[in-house]
Regions:
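Short aromatic/hydrophobic-glycine micro-motifs
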Residues: 12, 51, 134, 173-174
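DNA replication initiation on ssDNA origins
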Residues: 1-114
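DNA replication initiation modules
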Residues: 99-132, 151-180
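Surface-exposed flexible segments
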Residues: 66-72, 126-136
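Structural beta-sheet core signal
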Residues: 56, 147-149
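Short, conserved phosphate-binding/catalytic loop or strand-edge motifs used
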Residues: 138-146
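Structured loops at beta-to-helix junctions and adjacent beta-edge loops in soluble globular domains
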Residues: 60, 92, 118-120, 140, ...
Length: 180
């Protein structure tokens, strides 16, 4: 499946535009970069959730390579992760378990809301996208980017979401490590 096949099969929202003025270049910063809060980003990539479902976010301070990334639910009543910590938002929403606990597990899957393309520019050449417009593109480290494709309608069939992700990986549009 090619990027064109994916775009045809799964219509996408236009580029997500985050309304903010570019910031001035300063100590440690880059000029022309749009600033967005964690809360605004989560709201943009999860414009609608199945009833009773929540987005999952993982957050930790310190070295992100040490230890796990436990997920917690995100909703307006909870505090968003700090911009000072390492944060990760998954592409799917999940239902709480029967005991009320929240875990990002297949058994609690609600819907897939976007595709995340990781390691663009390093493991996956940016020209591999061949002019495809992403919903967002974030430089996560020098020369390494994460891109996203917000789906027009969330996929509520987990098997379909897995097949789509596998097709994106098989097409060479994302690092194979994104499947786990």
């Amino acid at each position: 499946m090619t990027a064109e096949d994916i775009e045809t099969a799964f219509p996408l929202d236009p580029l997500t535009v985050f309304l903010s003025d570019p910031v001035e270049a300063g100590k440690g910063g880059e000029g022309g970069v749009f600033q967005i809060t964690n809360a605004d980003f989560v709201a943009a990539v999860f414009p609608c959730l199945p009833e009773g479902a929540f987005a999952a976010v993982s957050s930790k301070s310190g070295d992100p390579s040490i230890g796990g990334w436990p997920a917690r639910r995100v909703d307006p009543a909870t505090e968003m992760p700090s911009a000072e910590t390492n944060n990760f938002v998954g592409c799917s929403s999940f239902y709480p378990g029967d005991d009320g606990s929240f875990k990002a597990r297949k058994s609690q899957f609600a819907a897939c809301h976007f595709l995340m393309l990781d390691d663009l520019g390093t493991k996956v050449p940016l020209d591999r996208l061949d002019g495809f417009d992403l919903s967002w593109l974030i430089e996560t480290s020098p020369g390494n980017h994460q891109g996203g494709i917000i789906l027009a309608e969330p996929l509520i069939d987990g098997a379909v979401a897995v097949r789509l992700l596998n097709a994106v990986i098989e097409a060479g549009l994302c690092d194979a490590g994104a499947s786990g």
